[in-house]
Structures are given as structure tokens and as C-alpha cells.
Regions:
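The beta1-alpha1 cofactor-binding region of Rossmann-like NAD(H)/NADP(H)-dependent oxidoreductases
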Residues: 61-71, 103
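Conserved glycine-rich Rossmann-like NAD(P)H-binding loop of the short-chain dehydrogenase/reductase
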Residues: 31-47
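SDR active-site lid
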Residues: 173-239
Length: 291
């Protein structure tokens, strides 16, 4: 598929204060795109916007808030004149056994990752139809394979993958393209936060190669940018993820067998696993909800 120049395009990135969102905003800006940053950390968003080489601005908003996101969409269009690209990247995570999980944190992962993505699309689709633009929904390896101790995250990412695939067919005749982005464990604040828990870190290290590695962020984001330039339906931040699609039907059975052994091994320590949202992004979400 031919590339679309990003020069002069207007891109909205949610979850843009750090990690994938922050670096993606920078790389889009370096290619000439004007960037609207959305998130829950005003100081960080302002700093990111100030470092970008192209025209950029930021908005404080909770992606689960319909009215707030609709207002952001109106203001971004008023500020830049149009919107060509929306990247639904905002996300949080929590680990640990489902039975012992904090129900509030578990539900919040679903709300931010799945419902928040749908709220984002609902707010920006009208302007994307005007520009015949592109919506990239960030999913994960967790959409392809189950991961014990990460039930909320897997459920949310499986959900956004399914919803985005449905949406693609619904909006195609308007000229809007919809993509799904897949990332394995990538060196972000969220992954580093999860690794602070000894059990979660050791479980991850026992995954089969190449899923047991933490991958550098810049090459992953470069591949996401390339997917945006091509308006791709599937974007793989690590190339080997493409091959996982062909075997995903076998993975639940394999994971059930291997997972039983591994969870039994760690059973005496499972009660020690943190039940809160991980990383600075999780802390920002908790602070926002606390008022």
C-alpha cells in the first residue's frame, strides 16, 4: 500500500503523556504532522507539546467521559481546522489472580481500554469522515493470546480488537480506514511498573521466546508510524507478532496446559501480587478519579 505523507496532517493521540503515546506524538511531529495530545497528566502533556518540532497542543480529558471527548474533538478541529488521524492509545493495566483482584481496578481497565477507545472513536468519527481519515486502535499481543494473571488487560485488548474490526467495515464506505496496532512487551512505564512486582516479572520471564523479551520502544513506534503512513488494517510493532495470527486458535489450549503448571508453581506467592493499576499512568488515573 502506498504511503500517505504526514506533512500538514493533524493527528490526535490519546494517552500521550508518556510511553508509546509520547514517542508516537514526537515521531509524527518530526514528519510534519500537527499533533493534539490527550491525557490525564497536564504537566507532562504540556512538556511533551513544548518539545515537539511542529505545531502541537494538549487537552486534559478522561477518555471514558463522552462529553469531555466530544468537546476535545470540537476544540481540536477549531484549533487545527481538521483531523486526519486518531490514535486510541490510552490504556491502563492491573495484574494478579482474578479471584483476588480489586474489582474497582479490574473494572477500570475495561472502562479505560475498551470503553474509552469506543468513546474516543464516537467523538472523532464525524471529523474523520470529513477528512476521509484514519483511526488506529492500539491493541496488544494480549488480544491474540490469553495471559493468566492479566485477565482484565486481555479482556480489554481482545475487546478493542474485535470492536475495531467491526468498525472498519461500518465506516469504510465513508472513506475512513481503521487499523489495529499490536505490541508485545515494550519498554514503557506500564511494563516497567508491572515488572516491579516480583511474581509478575518472574512469570513473564518464564514465557516462551520471543514473548519473554522486553522490546525497545523506538523501533516499535517506528513500525506504528509506518502503519499510519500506509493506513494499514494491521500494524505489528514487533514483526514476529504477525506470525502469531496464524496460530492464535491453538493458543488457549496451550496456555491452559502450561499455565496450570506455572500458576501452581507460584501459588504460595500469588497473594503477594499488587492489585492496583500499574505504573505512573495508573497512578495518574487513580489521582484523576480521586478528584
Amino acid at each position: 500500500m502506498s504511503k500517505v505523507s504526514l506533512q500538514g496532517q493533524v493527528a490526535v493521540v490519546t494517552g500521550a503523556a508518556r510511553g508509546v503515546g509520547e514517542l508516537l506524538a514526537r515521531k509524527l511531529s518530526e514528519r510534519g504532522a500537527k499533533v493534539a495530545l490527550v491525557g490525564l497528566e497536564p504537566d507532562e502533556l504540556k512538556a511533551v507539546a513544548g518539545r515537539l518540532p511542529s505545531d502541537a497542543d494538549w487537552w486534559y480529558a478522561d477518555v471514558t467521559d463522552h462529553e469531555a471527548l466530544a468537546q476535545v474533538a470540537r476544540e481540536v478541529k477549531a484549533r487545527f481546522g481538521k483531523i486526519d488521524i486518531v490514535v486510541a492509545n490510552a490504556g491502563v493495566a492491573v495484574g494478579g489472580p482474578f479471584e483476588e483482584s480489586d474489582p474497582v481496578a479490574w473494572r477500570r481497565v475495561i472502562e479505560v481500554n475498551l470503553v474509552g477507545s469506543a468513546v474516543t472513536a464516537r467523538a472523532f468519527l464525524p471529523v474523520l469522515k470529513e477528512s476521509r481519515g484514519y483511526l488506529l486502535q492500539i491493541a496488544s499481543l494480549a488480544a491474540i493470546t490469553p495471559a493468566p494473571m492479566m485477565s482484565a488487560y486481555c479482556a480489554s485488548k481482545s475487546g478493542v480488537e474485535a470492536y475495531a474490526n467491526c468498525l472498519r467495515a461500518e465506516v469504510a464506505y465513508h472513506g475512513v480506514k481503521v487499523g489495529v496496532g499490536y505490541l508485545s512487551w515494550t519498554d514503557t512505564d506500564m511494563v516497567r511498573g508491572a515488572d516491579q512486582d516480583d511474581v509478575m516479572r518472574e512469570l513473564r520471564q518464564r514465557l516462551p521466546w520471543p514473548a519473554n523479551k522486553t522490546y525497545p520502544l523506538p523501533p516499535a513506534v517506528d513500525r506504528i508510524v509506518a502503519g499510519i503512513e500506509r493506513r494499514s488494517a494491521k500494524v505489528y510493532a514487533q514483526p514476529w507478532l504477525r506470525g502469531m495470527q496464524s496460530i492464535r486458535g491453538y493458543l488457549p489450549g496451550i496456555i491452559a496446559t502450561v499455565g496450570k503448571r506455572e500458576i501452581k508453581r507460584f501459588a504460595p506467592r500469588l497473594s503477594q501480587v499488587s492489585t492496583g493499576l500499574v505504573g505512573s499512568g495508573g497512578a495518574a488515573d487513580e489521582k484523576h478519579r480521586a478528584g
